[in-house]
Amino acid sequence: MFYETIFNFFNSGILLFWGLLLVFPKRRLTQKIIAYPWVPLGIALGYIYFLSITSGTFSADFSSLNGLTEMFQNANPQGVAAGWLHYLAFDFWVGCWMLKNSQEKAVKHPWMILPLLCTFMLGPVGVLIYSLVLLGHKKLIAKTT
């Protein structure tokens, strides 16, 4: 089915971009990727596509845990794909911001590997770890000056 091809394209393709952030953070291509949100915007197009072919998304009750549970229980593959692309886009955007921010603050890249991996796999956990890295970096800078 066509929607499975689109899902696989985004789901597999994002691995290449995360790999660039992790392995080649200073390369010109990586710097372009973190400077402009083209990758998350591209994923957003896939997200819009899946939303457009998903029925019932906008009638879901987002105000209660029961409403969200019901939405997930009744989800079709297109709706699940839309949700997954939502995660891919936001997590990657956050990863790009973290890498760019860490480079501006002169955080050594080995300190960024765990936060980036956790952002890719666990979203907010990566942001928490990055915040701790920044706190430690700030204390280290203060200690040496």
Language-model segments: residues:
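Structural signature of hydrophobic alpha-helical transmembrane segments
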Residues: T5-G13, A81-L85
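Alpha-helical transmembrane segments of polytopic integral membrane proteins
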Residues: L16, F92-L99
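N-terminal signal-anchor/start-transfer transmembrane helix
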Residues: F9-Q31
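Helical transmembrane-bundle signal
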Residues: I14-L21, I43-F50, V127
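Hydrophobic, aromatic-rich membrane-embedded alpha-helical segments
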Residues: I113-G136
